């Protein structure tokens, strides 16, 4: 009977794990809607700033900000957005695989790679990559990240860019497409790529700026980059909750399959045990 007790113990253990997975799935479902709301709120902010930047740039053609100018690439920088927690399927792995492909390409060309990492899972992996230099790490931003938690990382990378220690800046994160689909994304942040709907191509009227339009442009560019990084973080959070929800659902479903298999095995073992006992009783009775 010890074998039957072990099987019952395994069934109970898997049921307990299944309950935990189901609870985590439901928590992720609730968090997805909250994160999607933040994502949708932050997106128009960045888009509006970009429109104003395009407008100001169009009115000051004699002044070209360095953030719009291409340079000879000797060093590149990445903001890498990962998760602080696991149990999110292949979310981090898929992003890191995409990054490693880029890193190998730059490394083969002799280009320095500098990283600002957001999320402990990315940091623990990327510390082992010898071809990169980590200049900033941000952990524990939580499920409701604030811009203030990211400003330090943004300013470190922008300072390196301003000092010509980085010639191109990227943002790597998981783009939220829908609840079932998340895609690794590497977005060029600097130099800023000209908008397809550039206001330069059409007639426009200008504003009177106070302070000077150049001062305003400098400030807006920093706000725009901060908003781009923040948008990447909230999209990655939405992707994380979706991936965790699906991972926990899969775990719960797989647990049910294993329980059914163990029940079948348990019933067969129990039937065999009963048959053996009946055979022994019948044999004993015939001897008497």
UniProtKB/Swiss-Prot annotation:
Keywords: ATP synthesis, Cell inner membrane, Cell membrane, CF(1), Hydrogen ion transport, Ion transport, Membrane, Transport. The keyword Transferase does not apply. It is found in: Cell inner membrane. Signal peptide: none annotated. Its main location: membrane. GO terms for cellular component: plasma membrane; proton-transporting ATP synthase complex. It is a peripheral membrane protein. The keyword Protein transport does not apply. One of its GO terms (molecular function) is ATP binding. InterPro entries: ATP_synth_F1_ATPase_gsu, ATP_synth_F1_gsu. GO terms for biological process: proton motive force-driven plasma membrane ATP synthesis. HAMAP family: ATP_synth_gamma_bact. F-type ATPases have 2 components, CF(1) - the catalytic core - and CF(0) - the membrane proton channel. CF(1) has five subunits: alpha(3), beta(3), gamma(1), delta(1), epsilon(1). CF(0) has three main subunits: a, b and c. Produces ATP from ADP in the presence of a proton gradient across the membrane. The gamma chain is believed to be important in regulating ATPase activity and the flow of protons through the CF(0) complex. Belongs to the ATPase gamma chain family. This is ATP synthase gamma chain. The gene is atpG.
């Amino acid at each position: 009977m010890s074998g039957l007790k072990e099987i019952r113990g395994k069934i109970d253990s898997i049921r307990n794990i299944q309950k935990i997975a189901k609870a985590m799935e439901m928590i992720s479902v609730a968090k997805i809607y909250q994160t999607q709301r933040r994502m949708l709120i932050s997106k128009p902010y960045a888009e509006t700033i970009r429109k104003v930047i395009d407008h100001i740039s169009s009115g000051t053609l004699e002044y070209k900000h360095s953030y719009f100018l291409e340079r000879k690439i000797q060093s590149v920088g990445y903001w890498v957005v990962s998760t602080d927690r696991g149990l999110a399927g292949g979310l981090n792995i898929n992003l890191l695989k995409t990054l490693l492909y880029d890193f190998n390409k730059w490394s083969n060309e002799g280009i320095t790679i500098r990283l600002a990492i957001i999320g402990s899972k990315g940091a623990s992996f990327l510390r082992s990559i010898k071809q990169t230099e980590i200049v900033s790490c941000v952990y524990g931003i939580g499920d409701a990240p604030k811009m203030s938690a990211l400003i330090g990382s943004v300013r470190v990378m922008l300072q390196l860019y301003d000092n010509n220690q980085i010639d191109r800046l990227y943002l790597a994160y998981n783009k939220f497409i829908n609840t079932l689909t998340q895609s690794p994304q590497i977005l060029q942040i600097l130099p800023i790529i000209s908008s397809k709907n550039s206001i330069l191509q059409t007639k426009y009227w200008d504003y009177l700026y106070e302070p000077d339009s150049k001062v305003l442009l400098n400030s807006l560019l920093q706000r725009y980059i901060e908003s781009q990084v923040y948008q990447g973080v909230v999209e990655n959070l939405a992707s994380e909750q979706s991936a965790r929800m699906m991972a926990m659902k899969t775990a719960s479903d797989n647990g049910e399959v294993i329980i059914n298999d163990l029940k079948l095995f348990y019933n067969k073992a129990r039937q065999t045990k009963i048959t053996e006992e009946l055979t022994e009783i019948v044999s004993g009775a015939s001897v008497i």
